[in-house]
Curated annotation (Swiss-Prot):
NCBIfam families: PRK00685.1. It comes from the Bacteria. The keyword tRNA-binding does not apply. Transmembrane segments: none annotated. Belongs to the UPF0173 family. It holds the Pfam family Lactamase_B_2. This is UPF0173 metal-dependent hydrolase Helmi_16730. PANTHER family: UPF0173 METAL-DEPENDENT HYDROLASE MJ1163, UPF0173 METAL-DEPENDENT HYDROLASE MJ1163-RELATED.
Length: 238
């Protein structure tokens, strides 16, 4: 069993009852997030790239909880220099952790950090395929549509079906609803949760319309979560 809690934007918490894994913990400055960063606990934090709405509060949370940050090698190294534990990986790489397995997947986006007048390049952006609590979860990060998504079921899950896809639909900075629908068809997940929309005016979308199209044109269940909602994955499935 795996509990998946949405905090708005691309911010999620995975909890199997033993370990808590945060993904892209954007709390401070997130206008739709219902809680503050100091209200969450985590054992691990996955960060898809260095932009402020994804790196977010990762370093502060890691300092407060002792959590280990998992990200690209360059971004993990940046976090280590800030005084926290971090494990660096590269796209295509996978590693087993006490809670399960993490694989870094390709994402088409940027990954820079602005500090004052300085721009820091912190490697490539990524997504994550997480196997945890007997379930498989794909967090796409910020990305445009890419055929690399076809590899999730074909190769990485060895023909098994993906349990849950967390896909951006906001457009402008990544996939919009049309491309997210194509991604859903390629990934063929049991369930999909749209993310990275309606946080700011530039990424406003009609999520109800997106859910209708996914329901009509695929056999994936589309779950629209309000910030603070939790989706529980249980029963059969990889």
């Amino acid at each position: 069993m795996l509990h998946v809690t949405f905090f708005g934007h691309a911010n999620f918490l995975l909890d199997d009852g033993q370990t808590k894994v945060l993904i892209d913990p954007f709390f401070t400055g997130n206008p739709v997030c219902p809680i503050k960063a100091d209200a969450v606990s985590a054992d691990y934090i996955l960060v898809s790239h260095g932009h402020g709405d994804h790196l977010g509060d990762a370093i502060d949370i890691a300092k407060g909880t002792g959590a280990t940050i998992i990200s690209s090698f360059e971004l993990a190294s940046y976090c280590q220099r800030k005084g926290v534990k971090a494990h660096g990986m590269a796209i295509g790489g996978k590693r087993d952790f006490p809670f399960g397995r993490v694989r870094l997947t390709a994402a088409v986006h940027g990954s820079g950090i602005i500090e004052g007048d300085n721009y820091l390049d912190v490697g490539n952006p990524c997504g994550f395929l997480v196997n945890m609590g007997g379930k498989s979860v794909y967090h796409a990060g910020d990305t445009g549509l890419t055929r690399d998504m076809e590899l999730i079921n074909m190769c990485f899950l060895k023909g098994g079906r993906l349990d849950l896809a967390l896909l951006p639909i906001g457009d402008n900075f990544g996939m919009g609803p049309e491309d997210a629908l194509y991604a859903t068809k390629m990934l063929h997940p049991r369930m999909i949760v749209p993310m990275h929309y309606n946080t700011f005016p530039v990424i406003e979308q009609d999520v109800a319309a997106f859910k209708r199209v996914v329901t009509e044109l695929t056999d994936s269940e589309c779950h629209v979560l309000a910030p603070g909602d939790t989706l529980t994955l249980n029963g059969h499935g990889r």
